């Protein structure tokens, strides 16, 4: 059992207790914290509260996180949006809210559970039992194209392409504010945040080099629709880089200074639109694009109507 305490800051005031904790610990779901709250493993100012309690500035929230237990990852019949498939690779369009592989608080309903059911025993095993077939990841609330490897040979090949930065990865996203330049590049090494352990940050001393190219697709009142091309693939790269220049992604509570005015929006507006790579067996260049999810299309329409 691990116990930690957090002081509520001004920009976090008004959040539900379960949501506040899921922001602090993005690897755990709100349902996970609702169970902890119900079992009185969460307190506010040393007093148990309901999950619906809205935290106040200077509240001290204390949580007891149970020790991780080993679990068997089971195949689950979860529908997949498949963009391409052959004997070596599978390209899927990951939906919003789906974690790529099991982790503490997310032992089921992950992409790994889904691909284990779909592919049976034909998945690479290089990343172990928890991450079969997984050669790269995108965040839980980021949607879009992702490569799954169906054998170890394909996995080694694709992993090398990623290491050499030769995989073409194009994202689209909506950021807060009006980006002045039509295009540009953000360069800044990314590492763990020195204080908030769940966040990444620009860290030139201890971080890894990261480069993000961007292009403005459309401007709205107070928001900008953008395209991003990654040279590197660091954790939360686009989210950290855009926040570092004053334009956090719409809906990204972790890296913005306040809550989104769009109450229905859960998580950042970021979509892995296109992925291109050399096929590990044929040597041919392949490129696939995932259509924008419905929530993203609706958000664009809403922003256009308010311009």
Which role fits each region the language model picked out?
Residues 92, 240, 251:
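Active-site flanking residues adjacent to catalytic metal/cofactor-binding acidic residues
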Residues 128-160, 168, 172, 187, ...:
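The conserved catalytic core of RNA pseudouridine synthases
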């Amino acid at each position: 059992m691990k116990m930690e305490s957090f002081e509520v800051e001004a920009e976090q005031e008004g959040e539900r207790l379960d949501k506040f904790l899921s922001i602090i610990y993005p690897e755990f779901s709100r349902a996970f914290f609702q169970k902890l709250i119900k079992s009185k493993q969460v307190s506010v100012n040393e007093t148990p509260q309901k999950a619906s309690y809205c935290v106040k500035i200077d509240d001290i929230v204390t949580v007891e996180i149970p020790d991780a237990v080993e679990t068997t990852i089971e195949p689950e019949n979860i529908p997949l949006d498949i963009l391409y498939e052959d004997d070596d690779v599978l390209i899927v369009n990951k939906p919003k809210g789906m974690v790529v592989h099991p982790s503490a608080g997310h032992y089921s309903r992950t992409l790994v559970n889904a691909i284990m059911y779909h592919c049976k025993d034909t998945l690479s095993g290089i990343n172990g039992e928890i991450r079969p077939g997984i050669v790269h990841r995108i965040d839980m609330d980021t949607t879009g194209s992702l490569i799954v490897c169906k054998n170890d040979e394909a996995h080694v090949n694709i992993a090398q392409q990623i290491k050499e930065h030769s995989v073409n990865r194009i994202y689209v996203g909506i950021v807060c504010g009006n980006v002045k330049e039509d295009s540009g590049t953000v360069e800044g090494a990314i590492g763990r945040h020195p204080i908030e352990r769940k966040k990444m940050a620009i860290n030139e001393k201890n971080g890894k080099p990261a480069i993000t190219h961007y292009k403005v697709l459309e401007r709205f009142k107070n928001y900008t629709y953008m395209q991003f091309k990654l040279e590197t693939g660091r954790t939360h790269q686009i989210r950290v880089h855009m926040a570092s220049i004053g334009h956090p992604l719409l809906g990204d509570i972790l890296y913005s200074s306040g809550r989104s005015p769009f109450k229905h929006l859960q998580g950042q507006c970021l979509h892995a639109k296109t992925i291109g790579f050399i096929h590990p067996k044929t040597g041919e260049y392949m490129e696939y694009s995932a259509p924008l999810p419905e929530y993203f299309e609706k958000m664009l329409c809403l922003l256009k109507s308010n311009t």
